[in-house]
Amino acid sequence: MKKQRNLRSMAAQAVEQVVEQGQSLSNILPPLQQKVSDKDKALLQELCFGVLRTLSQLDWLINKLMARPMTGKQRTVHYLIMVGLYQLLYTRIPPHAALAETVEGAVAIKRPQLKGLINGVLRQFQRQQEELLAEFNASDARYLHPSWLLKRLQKAYPEQWQSIVEANNQRPPMWLRVNRTHHSRDSWLALLDEAGMKGFPHADYPDAVRLETPAPVHALPGFEDGWVTVQDASAQGCMTWLAPQNGEHILDLCAAPGGKTTHILEVAPEAQVVAVDIDEQRLSRVYDNLKRLGMKATVKQGDGRYPSQWCGKQQFDRILLDAPCSATGVIRRHPDIKWLRRDRDIPELAQLQSEILDAIWPHLKSGGTLVYATCSVLPEENSLQIKAFLQRTADAELCETGTPEQPGKQNLPGAEEGDGFFYAKLIKK
């Protein structure tokens, strides 16, 4: 039996690690969830994701409610108060329970002397909630995005930035990819129906299913047997443009965690696939995905800027480059991105993408296809990146995705309920 732990203090410490230390929630949360009971796992996730999604609002409120910010060793208390405010604002937890558990969290973080302060701040919010929220809703903080990102979105999308921000602040739907080597989408939807769950097919992507209500993977028919994979619809769109064929040599570059590697093999089971990623730790996820789906690929650790180190002079029929990016298209799914990224990261990422594109292009066969994809919505990483590549690469030709002046296809967050994603299909003359 798991030891009873204070979830509010655990959530506060996790959020502090993201915001103050730049750690990714996807690395922090799973080990924490192993320490709590199954029924508490979902609440811990909700508190962490929710606080990060609404961080700027909670920060704004604390600055209004407290004369001085909590600093130094007491900084965790700042995040504990955030967790308390989030519960009062956004959950159905009874206020008395939310307050009691949050105040008790001070003991868990070894700050019992501050229980009275935490209780006082949260009760003050309850008394002043109406006027505080009215003031907040008239401020720029209401967009729940850092100012640097808001400015970039406003510049790139003068007509659409508000809908992008709104989509980023929503909870994401759960999308699945049906493994066509086991089931047609319709036959798997029938199995889902028999299991008492409802799903909806995507209009454009033939393997994509959206669940009416998110569910744990072990409840999905055939998940352990590889019948279905969790993957956003927009990520599945890569296969529309890559169009892999049996017998081809295909490179999946920046492949971890392996969702697109396995999708290639579902579409073209007899393709020879090489999956490469720079992060050796994340490559373990590629192996796990291949094993669950019963598939084989050549998996290598390597830097996309130096392909000769891991593939010699080998050339490929098709290359999928899911480039390292700001991930600004998947904020609704990973709200910590808003607080992990910095404005200075964007030109650095654009430079890295440019170097990888230039390095991998010679490894594409004449007549071959390269699909450049990102989960970003920023032009510097997307259309401007491809436009510059086309201008300096004489044997590269844009195919089916946009125009040379405005290359690529940009999906915005929430469009057809998918994530923000960019694709450009390039052919080697």
UniProtKB/Swiss-Prot annotation:
Active site, renumbered: 375
Location (main, coarse): cytoplasm
Function per UniProt: Specifically methylates the cytosine at position 967 (m5C967) of 16S rRNA.
Keywords from the UniProt entry: Cytoplasm, Methyltransferase, RNA-binding, rRNA processing, S-adenosyl-L-methionine, Transferase
Family (UniProt): Belongs to the class I-like SAM-binding methyltransferase superfamily. RsmB/NOP family.
Superkingdom: Bacteria
Short name of one Pfam family: NusB
Matches recorded under InterPro entries: MeTrfase_RsmB-F_NOP2_cat, MeTrfase_RsmB-F_NOP2_dom, NusB-like_sf, NusB_RsmB_TIM44, RCMT, rRNA_ssu_MeTfrase_B, rRNA_ssu_MeTfrase_B_ent, RsmB-like_ferredoxin
GO molecular function, one term: RNA binding
GO cellular component, one term: cytosol
Protein name: Ribosomal RNA small subunit methyltransferase B
Name of the top EC class for this enzyme: transferase
Record-linked PROSITE patterns: NOL1_NOP2_SUN (PS01153), SAM_MT_RSMB_NOP (PS51686)
SUPFAM superfamilies tied to this protein: NusB-like, S-adenosyl-L-methionine-dependent methyltransferases
E.C. number: 2.1.1.176
Keyword Hydrolase listed: no
NCBIfam families listed in its UniProt record: PRK10901.1, PRK14902.1, rsmB
Binding site for S-adenosyl-L-methionine: 254-260, 277, 303, 322
Localization per Swiss-Prot or TrEMBL: Cytoplasm
Chemical reaction(s) catalysed: cytidine(967) in 16S rRNA + S-adenosyl-L-methionine = 5-methylcytidine(967) in 16S rRNA + S-adenosyl-L-homocysteine + H(+)
Name of the encoding gene: rsmB
Biological process (GO), any one: regulation of DNA-templated transcription
